[in-house]
């Protein structure tokens, strides 16, 4: 199975920290945020990883190299201009293959085990599905949530619990068939269409999740990781935004 880490954002809310350093290389708990993702993926047996980048992307490649230092096989998908989430994934499809793949937003921190992606990918194939999303309880920053999750795991426009998309999902390449490579495109409209077709499912994660989208949350996560108060399981409180709108 292959994975993609989304790392092309400018990091406007992180300025001035991101004026000279790309957001994925900001350090938390003694290492760059993106390295936490790489290590967790490799530990789950997912070593083939594609990373997209735009702003200061050459620094990401210089810092991570080919991934051998982490036991990974890294490949890069540079974007001359940021293509947004769906546009970036569509451009990287030739490197991701024809099977369902895992996508992780580079600016979230979560204790979810990526090894669970194998089962979700198999379920997508078996049901001819297009998307599986990891969902979390709505944080105070995004109380309205994103999508409704029914008891049978189906994502729906109404009914069930309305939860927040965690920025982690398994996708079938067919979801992006209508996106022209090199064209900016948002992910949320594609997910809404998949939900309407009945090809999107999800699961609620009741563990730790944090959107590392502001300097304050970065500092809080760094302090907790460095202090050993959350280790591999995450911070005591989740904090987030509407990651499906990226």
Predicted regions located by residue number:
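Active-site metal-binding loops of divalent metal-dependent hydrolases
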Residues: 10, 106-108
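Short acidic-glycine loop/turn motifs at beta-strand connectors
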Residues: 149-153
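Conserved beta-strand segments of alpha/beta enzyme cores
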Residues: 24, 73-75, 199-201
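Catalytic-core segments of class I nucleotidyltransferases/pyrophosphorylases
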Residues: 46, 102, 109, 113-126, ...
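Short beta-strand-to-loop element that shapes/binds the nucleotide-sugar donor at the catalytic cleft/hinge
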Residues: 55, 131-146
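N-proximal low-complexity "stem/linker" segments adjacent to membrane-targeting elements
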Residues: 1-5, 10-16, 25
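Conserved N-terminal catalytic core of the sugar/cofactor nucleotidyltransferase
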Residues: 1-5, 27, 31-105, 114-116, ...
């Amino acid at each position: 199975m292959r994975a993609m880490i989304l790392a092309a954002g400018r990091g406007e809310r992180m300025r001035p920290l991101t004026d000279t350093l790309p957001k994925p290389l900001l350090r938390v708990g003694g290492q760059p945020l993106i390295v936490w993702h790489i290590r967790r993926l490799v530990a789950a047996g997912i070593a083939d990883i594609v990373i997209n980048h735009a702003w200061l992307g050459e620094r990401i490649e210089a810092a991570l190299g080919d991934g051998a230092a982490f036991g990974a096989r890294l490949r890069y998908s540079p974007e001359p201009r940021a293509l947004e989430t769906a546009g970036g994934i569509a451009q990287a499809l030739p490197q991701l293959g024809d099977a369902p793949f895992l996508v992780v937003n580079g600016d979230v921190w979560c204790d979810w085990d990526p090894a669970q992606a194998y089962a979700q990918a198999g379920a997508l194939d078996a049901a001819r599905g297009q998307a599986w999303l990891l969902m979390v309880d709505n944080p105070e920053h995004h109380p309205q949530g994103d999508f409704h999750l029914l008891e049978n795991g189906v994502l729906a426009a109404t009914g069930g619990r309305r939860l927040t998309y965690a920025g982690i999902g398994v996708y079938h390449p067919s979801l992006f068939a209508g996106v022209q490579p090199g064209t900016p495109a948002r992910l949320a409209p594609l997910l809404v269409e998949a939900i309407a077709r009945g090809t999107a499912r999800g699961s609620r994660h009741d563990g730790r999740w944090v959107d590392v989208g502001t300097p304050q949350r970065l500092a809080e996560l760094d302090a907790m990781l460095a202090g050993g108060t959350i280790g591999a399981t995450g911070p005591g409180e989740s904090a987030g935004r509407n990651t499906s709108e990226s």
